[in-house]
Amino acid sequence: MEPFSKKSYQRKVEAIFTRFPSVQKVPFKDAYKPGLENMLKFEGVLGNPHKSLRTIHVAGTNGKGSVANMLASALSACGLRVGLYTSPHIVDFRERMRIVGEKQSAELVSEEYVYDFLCRYEADM
């Protein structure tokens, strides 16, 4: 595995956008893949984390980001550790993934963590 650097991180993120156009902005018809086969396979690779985590999925036409952020803040204020994933990002891919801390301040997931994850699961994606 190539050691972490800003350049190696950026190459990994760009590779994900190239390999999976639905992660980035593409016409819907090009990004949509019917069926759950790929998602079920990837869940297995990750060890089916959805079976051990309590989650809230916010869906709908408008206001998902606002509702998700309000829920994250409220749950954090109640003393729970909260992770939040939203899409799309504005500048940095890591904006999509946040851990809402006790002080309700969202911190970006480190580039090193994302890079390690992408390297570890690259062959399975």
Please place each PLM-identified region on the residue numbering:
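N-terminal phosphate/diphosphate-binding loop that engages ATP/GTP or pyrophosphate donors
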Residues: 69-124
